[in-house]
Amino acid sequence: MREFRWYLRMLAEVHHGRERHMGNTHDWLQLQKQAHREFALRLAAVTDWEAPTPDTDWNVRDLVRHVVEEQQWVPQLLAGRTLAQAKRELAPLGHDLVAEWGLYSFAATEAWDAAAPDALVTLSYDRVSVTDYLREQVSDVAIHSWDLARAIGAPEELDRFLVEAVWTVFEPQRDTLAASGLYAPPVPLPDDAPLQSRLLAITGRDDRLAA
């Protein structure tokens, strides 16, 4: 019941949070909730867990497991634990990934809401601020929401404010991302292409291709 009340509160906050979005200022806590809502909507529509995804090494099950596992880490790292300490606290995921998503999405959101924005978090590559970690996590869930939508044939359009915010994270790093090997090569698109298409293109995704 507590989780259900929280979910209703999250949806209401996302709706009202849009009214507070102005210019280049982004309320990343609201965007985290919106990103999780985007993913949850697609997850609820999954019927074929073996379907391929735009992440060519993953099927739908693998993709969902990755996103859920990322949420498992959030409360541990925000509590100040090292990677080794956090890893010891992580439980293996169960077979019901929809239920696991609900559990760990809730826990992650509660942890984000309670975290001090300027506190430092130990990640695999550096110590960063809570705010930087939050932006990274919002961006990851947003992109994978599109991946999941494409994989299952669900609506692919993401929330406009979410896309605009993630663009401010990825666009300044386009050269770094291209050189990282984490993504396929960027897809060339004209400057007047939709912002979501250009965002996806930075990560090597081409939404013009047939699903």
Predicted feature locations:
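Extended, alpha-helix-rich binding/interface surfaces that flank or overlap catalytic cores
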Residues: 63
